[in-house]
Curated annotation (Swiss-Prot):
Cofactors demanded by this protein: Zn(2+)
UniProt KW keywords: Cytoplasm, GTP-binding, Hydrolase, Metal-binding, Nucleotide-binding, Ribosome biogenesis, RNA-binding, rRNA-binding, Zinc
Natural source organism: Haemophilus influenzae (strain PittEE)
Location(s) in or outside the cell: Cytoplasm
Record keyword Zinc present: yes
Presence of keyword NAD: no
Quaternary data: Monomer. Associates with 30S ribosomal subunit, binds 16S rRNA.
Biological process annotations from GO: ribosomal small subunit biogenesis
Function noted in UniProt: One of several proteins that assist in the late maturation steps of the functional core of the 30S ribosomal subunit. Helps release RbfA from mature subunits. May play a role in the assembly of ribosomal proteins into the subunit. Circularly permuted GTPase that catalyzes slow GTP hydrolysis, GTPase activity is stimulated by the 30S ribosomal subunit.
Domain CP-type G, chain residue ranges per copy: 103-271
Top-level taxon: Bacteria
Protein name: Small ribosomal subunit biogenesis GTPase RsgA
């Protein structure tokens, strides 16, 4: 009798269980006894791999470390307590023993495990978009919701503006004005021509920043311009799908010559928000806050409800109709994505 064909979800679950089994097996390979380790010291996680992490000590030296099994999830930017080994074991030089409380973190939805943290202790999120494959205000709004909820300052960067004719550039600037009007900072740059790159590096010097955005928007090109010695692999936009080809495999923290730190993380084709509810997404729109709670009905859905203060603010020109429409698209997508819990990672 022919075997019944597995569904896509069953195949994914089998692959996930297999990967977790291999992960547990590998963790047993290296066991550190207390006498093999030196004194505790402070460090920062600069790269996170599946079962190891690279930690930078206070002298700027980087060591590959194992993780204590009692630790919760570890991400780039985490401040940790670790101990250096007296010798290397299978290329590992020490053990991370504790994680300091995080000032903040950003996470993305994970198909199997709910939320998966990406990075921690961030001062600014650089939302990189581009004129190719297309400028998506909906994607920008998704990232801004995350910034508002996490309490992290965003910077909207439009890359590859050298590809625009003057008329096209004016049209893009008009589209982005809705963000400037509510206090978001916009920077139009070109890694190729160098336009406004000095302004970007000056902003990056003000703390720890992370680049986010779809693949193909030029994040790796920007890093190559800011840090030529890194030589991050650059990916092209697929002619077939219009989506960027993945170039970064692990999140990594870089120190910038002019000061500050930059975290580069793997590209995400679709930044899912299914882990949020409608109330959280509403709080992610900063210009909505002054009218929330003033609607006629407490359970107002902010659509055709009578006495909706939010809709009235849109009609009066106080709130952008584009942002208002994007907001409802995000709300409508919640039930769909929560039932499927499916998004595409590069």
């Amino acid at each position: 009798m022919a075997k019944r064909k597995l569904t896509q979800n069953q195949t994914r679950r089998i692959q996930s269980n297999n990967a977790k089994t291999l992960h547990r097996h590998k963790k047993k390979d290296i066991e550190w006894s207390d006498e093999m380790l030196g004194e505790s010291q402070e460090g920062v996680v600069v790269t996170r791999y599946s079962i190891h992490a690279d930690v930078e000590n206070e002298q700027g030296e980087i060591y590959r470390c194992n993780l204590r099994r009692t630790l919760s999830s570890l991400v780039v930017g985490d401040k940790v307590v670790w101990r250096k080994g007296n010798e290397q074991l299978q290329g590992v030089s020490g053990v991370i023993e504790a994680i300091h409380p995080r000032e903040n973190e950003i996470s993305r939805p994970d198909y199997y495990d709910g939320l998966k943290p990406i990075a921690a202790n961030i001062d600014r999120i650089i939302i990189v978009s581009a004129v190719l494959p297309t400028l998506s205000l909906n994607i920008i709004d998704r990232y801004l919701v995350v910034c508002e909820i996490a309490g992290i300052t965003p910077l909207i960067v439009l890359n590859k503006v050298d590809l625009l004719a003057q008329e096209q550039r004016q049209e893009i600037e008009d589209q982005l004005k809705i963000y400037q009007d509510i206090g978001y900072e916009i920077l139009m740059i070109s890694a190729k021509s160098g336009e406004n790159m000095e302004k970007l590096t000056a902003l990056l010097a003000q703390g720890t920043a992370i680049f986010v955005g779809q693949s193909g928007v030029g994040k790796s090109s920007l890093i190559n311009h800011i840090l030529p010695s890194v030589n991050a692999q650059v990916g092209d936009v697929s002619e077939t799908s219009g989506l960027g080809q993945h170039t970064t495999t692990s999140s990594r923290l870089y120190h910038l010559p002019q000061g500050g730190n930059l975290i580069d993380s793997p590209g995400i084709r679709e930044f899912g928000l299914w882990h949020l509810d409608a109330e959280q997404i509403t709080k992610g729109y900063r210009e909505f806050q002054y009218v929330l709670g003033t609607c006629k009905f407490r359970d107002c859905k902010h659509l055709s409800d009578p006495g909706c203060a939010l809709r009235e603010a849109v009609e009066q020109g106080k709130i952008s109709p584009v942002r208002y429409d994007n907001y409802h698209r995000l709300i409508e997508s919640l039930s769909e994505t929560k039932s499927q819990r499916h998004f595409s990672l590069v």
